[in-house]
Amino acid sequence: MLLHILYLVGITAEAMTGALAAGRRRMDTFGVIIIATATAIGGGSVRDILLGHYPLGWVKHPEYVIIVATAAVLTTIVAPVMPYLRKVFLVLDALGLVVFSIIGAQVALDMGHGPIIAVVAAVTTGVFGGVLRDMFCKRIPLVFQKELYAGVSFASAVLYIALQHYVSNHDVVIISTLVFGFFARLLALRLKLGLPVFYYSHEGH
């Protein structure tokens, strides 16, 4: 139940960030809803397609689409106050990342896949919504450039899978992973942590 509630909060927050990205590209209402939907539930859809997990999450639960579309339209109305809520969105985004990662890993495990595929599914669920958002908005995805985002998703998934072998209470496993991933993400933001950046400037290749 806790994970489901946090998931709904997560897709709402991600939908709003997607709507803002669409607004920066001066898209109409339809475009705003599409970008918001891709951001919020795109990662889970990519995961389900790769794993052959059908029906897709939003097909099985169409209320997710309604929640996301409503959040997108609401964002166009309250956009002027959004800059004042930046810290709130950072917190919600951190929670959403870990929740998406946990759900992605569990879907793969429930299908009988091993730890490696479960981690891949977790990272796909956690980051690919943002990747789709940035690609649709003609930007190099932020997750590929500077932020320690996919790394937090990866570490959270590894911890979640590992804890299941040592802790019998699944709620404890979920909460422990949430706490770890949440604070790891906020610490990465605070200290501006990121992976090494590769730069190649030779024009002949």
UniProtKB/Swiss-Prot annotation:
Cytoplasmic side: 1-29, 86-87, 133-147, 190-205
Keyword Transmembrane helix: yes
Keywords: Cell inner membrane, Cell membrane, Membrane, Transmembrane, Transmembrane helix
Subcellular location: Cell inner membrane
InterPro entries tied to this protein: Gly_transporter (IPR005115)
Membrane topology of this protein: Multi-pass membrane protein
Pfam families tied to this protein: Gly_transporter (PF03458)
Spans traversing the lipid bilayer: 30-50, 65-85, 88-108, 112-132, 148-168, 169-189
Cystine residue pairs: none
GO cellular component terms attached to this protein's record: plasma membrane
Periplasmic topological domain: 51-64, 109-111
Similarity section: Belongs to the UPF0126 family.
PANTHER family per UniProt: INNER MEMBRANE PROTEIN, UPF0126 INNER MEMBRANE PROTEIN YADS-RELATED
Protein's recorded name: UPF0126 inner membrane protein YicG
